[in-house]
Amino acid sequence: MKLHELKSAPKSRNHKAKVVGRGHGSGLGKTSGRGQKGQKARKSGRTRPGFEGGQTPLYRRLPKFGFQTVGFKKQTLSVSLDIIAKLNETTIDRELLVKHGIISSKTNEPIKVIGNKIDKKIHLKINKISEGAKKAIQSAGGSIELI
């Protein structure tokens, strides 16, 4: 494919820009479809979002609430059992997940395995695991080592 062979998507070029203020014969001359005077006829003639005509707006009438401690929240990396099942490995740990590109090598966050279906026997060395994933691995004959 070359630059001169590129084509637009069908119907993507049908919209014509509205040309206004070019004489009364165009149908959109003089006031350009904005009517006569008034706030909406001016440039920037709209109110800001949340403005209620001078009345105290709802977002100021309601009390502030909540606080998020984003910097202190413990983050975990979730890895699904479906992804682990696709790996042709029997022992799975952080290094293996990094090697296969499932998690980044730069993160140091704990890994949590989630899911509830797996049919092959694996040995996991991870930080956390959900109850469903734990039952699924143990019923398939696998083992879990929490580190």
From Swiss-Prot:
Example GO CC term: the record gives:
cytosolic large ribosomal subunit
Q: In terms of domain of life, where is this protein from?
A: Bacteria
Give the similarity note. Belongs to the universal ribosomal protein uL15 family.
Compositional bias per record (Basic residues), positions renumbered to this chain: 10-21, 37-46
Going by the UniProt record, its keywords in alphabetical order are: Ribonucleoprotein, Ribosomal protein, RNA-binding, rRNA-binding
Listed InterPro entries = Ribosomal_uL15 (IPR030878), Ribosomal_uL15/eL18 (IPR021131), Ribosomal_uL15/eL18_sf (IPR036227), Ribosomal_uL15_bac-type (IPR005749)
Q: Which HAMAP family match?
A: Ribosomal_uL15
Q: State the name under which the record lists this protein.
A: Large ribosomal subunit protein uL15
Q: How does it assemble?
A: Part of the 50S ribosomal subunit.
The UniProt function text for this chain reads: Binds to the 23S rRNA.
Against Gene3D superfamilies, the record matches this protein to:
3.100.10.10
- Region of interest (Disordered), residue spans: 1-57
Organism, by scientific name, is: Mycoplasmoides gallisepticum (strain R(low / passage 15 / clone 2)) (Mycoplasma gallisepticum)
Mark out the compositionally biased spans (Gly residues). Answer: 22-36
What Pfam families does the database record attribute to this sequence?
Ribosomal_L27A (PF00828)
Q: Name one GO biological process term.
A: translation
The molecular function terms in GO held by this entry are: rRNA binding; structural constituent of ribosome
